[in-house]
Every structure is written in structure tokens, then in C-alpha cells.
Amino acid sequence: MDSIRIRGGKPLSGKIRISGAKNAALPILCATLLSDGESLLRNVPALRDIETTSALLRFLGRNVETAPPLVKVGAGDNVRPEAPYELVKQMRASVMVLGPLLARFGRAKVSLPGGCQIGTRPVDQHLKGLEALGATIRLSRGYIVAECKRLRGAEVVFDLPTVTGTENLMMAAALAKGRTTLVNCAREPEVEELGRVLNKMGARVSGAGTDVIHIEGADELEPFDHAIISDRIEAGTYMVAAAAAGGDVLIENAPLEDLEAVAAKLRQAGVEVGREGDCVRVRREGRPLRAVDVTTAPHPGFPTDMQAQFMVLMCLAQGTSRIVETIFENRFMHVPELARMGAHIDVDGHTAHVHGGAPLSGATVMATDLRASASLVIAGLVATEGETEVLRVYHLDRGYEFMERKLAQLGADTARVEGRDG
């Protein structure tokens, strides 16, 4: 397994460009199952999760050509509406093939999902919604087995906002007969992006990006050509990295309008954040950081996917900050690794108290999930002595395109070491 080595203590300066959004590309790749013909996705990042989804689509019978930032998906000769454990276990977003397969072919057999181990993250809301549209669903030996004639539009009320659940139901409803109304939907920009693509394909989607979405299903859908939006979480990660390491960084293609909750907390902490041309500028030169409290929330609140990175920033601030995780259970697995570097953090259930001000030191640490791995890289950037080695960076490669190279562009001393066991 590869690792990343970092020698910290250097301020960051310069300019980097943000890649396409992984969390937008994955459901849009799944949406290609809804039509024949060749669809073209542009601005697709070169990530492990994109490779996994492409492999899954090939297994299902699609022709997939991947040459990021371009991915082509065309109809194959034989459709196999079964997503096996060997592929789905690698990434929980694989469950999003369930809705398209069921709507298009009348049956689907999809393994229960895997991916980052940050809580149970159940799929019950997906199944409840598909049953409301007329599907018959059973669980058999670790698989979801779903069947239907043609799905029919209905009202589905989610018990809680779920991004992948909202997206799965949107795709299924795009081929359902009649009108579907989804209530208490996730409002993330990636959901809105999927709505744009489904409209290009011939469905009529309104309200995507709000808590109520209406979908008028079509008898058949067309292939599409679409450029993926920028990755707001990647942008937020580099904003926090620039704030933590200090310096002056321009982040090109960063969707600041989707990061207002993160930008507001950075400003409260004493960091300058603003627009400069087509870039977001993040600057902290010589100013101390202030401790601020953060509570994660569904969009447009503070994203759970930025919690670990922001915790590292608060390790450097004077005073104690409180970080409350409301979205996922078991999402403080980075805390013991940060403690190895000298962080003082107390965890009580869903709340972490970060006692900042003590310097971090380099250490060998182990990534446990995607965003935790990014937080450990940021911690390595600010470690005042010694070298940091982050093991198991295959987690990082699931969601960050060439992170060590982009940081090196900004002056960081980072390098990938191939083949390190961990």
C-alpha cells in the first residue's frame, strides 16, 4: 500500500485548481443505466471511486471508456442487473445502481453496500421509497432483491434527509409512470446536479436542491453530454489546509457559494476568505487562530465531510472548541491518530472538545476513512518537527485527485511512497 510523507512547517502559497465533484459524478454515472446510446461525462476526476463505479457498470453490461476528465458510457450487448459484493463492498455509493436497474429492467439484485466505515449508514430509506413506487423488495443473504412491473409515481416522505437515498429515488422516478413527489429531501448541490442531468435525459425534475422534489417520469430517456460541477469538499479541504499552514492561496474553480458555512467558520477563526476573480483566496499570514464551535448539519449547514479537517485547524487555535457530529456515528476515528501527533481532544459521544494551542509533531499515522485521511495530511503540513507518514492512503485516493501533487504546487514538502505496508 502507498503512503504519503510530509515534512511540515512551511506556509502554503500559490494557486491550485479544483477537480470535478466525485459525489456528483457517481450518481450521474449510475444514471447512464437509464438509457441506451452513448453518454459523455466531462470534468470527471481520476479517483478510485470512479474506477470502482466504472468497473461496476462494465459488470452490469455497459461499455465504459475512462480517460479522465472524460468518461464515455454506452449500451452493451448483455444486461446483467446484478451488482456483486466484490464490487459493492468497496464503495457504499454503489447502491445507487438499484433505482436505475429496477426502473429500467424491472429487477435488480444489489449487494448491501460497503465503503468508509463511519457508522451503519443504512439503506432503509432507499428501500422504503422504492416500495412506495411499487417495487417488491426482500433481503436475501446480504443482497437486496427488488422486482417490479413498471414503477408508478407516488409521494415518498423520507424520515431524514439522505443524499444517496434522494438520488436513488430521483433516478427510479425518472422512468416511473406519472408524477413522483419526494419530501424531506437532501438539498446538497450534487442532488441539484443530478436533477439537471435527468432533465437533459428527458425527465421533468423540479425542486432539486430544495426539500421537495417533483419528478414527471418518461417512457424512455436519452443519453447525455454533461460537465460535472467542481468538488466543494475538495475545495473546502484546501481552504482549511491553507488556513492551517498559513500563507496566501488561490483556489481556482472553487464553488464558494456552496461553501458558505465553511467560509463563515474560517472567518470566525481569523482567516481571510474571499473571491478574487475566478478564484477563492484564503490568507492567514502571522495572525493567531481563534477557537470556534462547529456542529455538522445537512446542506446548507456545515458539512460532515469537512469535520475532520476543521478539527485539525482547531488543534492550532488558542482555547477550547466544541465539534458536534450530528450526521454519522463513529466519525471521530481520526482523533486517536491526531493524539499520536500531540493533539489534545476529548470525545464524549457525538461531541469532541478540542483543546488547542499545543504544537503538533510528526508521526506515523493510519488513515481510517476518506476525510480522516485528508485531516491527517493537513496535520502533517502543520507539524513543527519531524516527518509525518500517512498510511493506507487508498482511502485518500477514493476522493482526492493527486492531493500530494497539488500541495507540492503550493510549496508543501509532500511525496507519495509506493508500496508501503500498513
From Swiss-Prot:
In short, the EC number is 2.5.1.7
- The active-site annotation reads 116
Report which superkingdom the organism of origin falls in. Answer: Bacteria
What this protein catalyses is: phosphoenolpyruvate + UDP-N-acetyl-alpha-D-glucosamine = UDP-N-acetyl-3-O-(1-carboxyvinyl)-alpha-D-glucosamine + phosphate
Q: Which InterPro entries does this entry report, sorted A to Z?
A: Enolpyruvate_Tfrase_dom, Enolpyruvate_Tfrase_sf, MurA_subfamily, RNA3'P_cycl/enolpyr_Trfase_a/b, UDP_GlcNAc_COvinyl_MurA
**Key words of the record:** Cell cycle, Cell division, Cell shape, Cell wall biogenesis/degradation, Cytoplasm, Peptidoglycan synthesis, Pyruvate, Transferase
Q: Does the keyword Cell division apply?
A: yes
* Binding, UDP-N-acetyl-alpha-D-glucosamine: 92, 121-125, 305, 327
Q: Which amino acids does the record list as binding phosphoenolpyruvate? A: 22-23
Q: Which pathway or pathways does this protein act in?
A: Cell wall biogenesis; peptidoglycan biosynthesis
Subcellular location per the Swiss-Prot or TrEMBL entry = Cytoplasm
Name positions with the PTM 2-(S-cysteinyl)pyruvic acid O-phosphothioketal. 116
The answer to whether the entry has keyword Cell cycle is: yes
GO CC annotations? cytoplasm
Q: Which GO terms describe its biological process?
A: cell division; cell wall organization; peptidoglycan biosynthetic process; regulation of cell shape; UDP-N-acetylgalactosamine biosynthetic process
Q: Which GO terms describe its molecular function?
A: UDP-N-acetylglucosamine 1-carboxyvinyltransferase activity
Give the family this protein belongs to, as stated in its UniProt record: Belongs to the EPSP synthase family. MurA subfamily.
Summarize the protein's role: Cell wall formation. Adds enolpyruvyl to UDP-N-acetylglucosamine.
Identification of the protein by name: UDP-N-acetylglucosamine 1-carboxyvinyltransferase
Name the species this protein comes from: Sorangium cellulosum (strain So ce56) (Polyangium cellulosum (strain So ce56))
Q: Which lineage ranks, top first, belong to the organism behind this chain?
A: Bacteria, Pseudomonadati, Myxococcota, Polyangia, Polyangiales
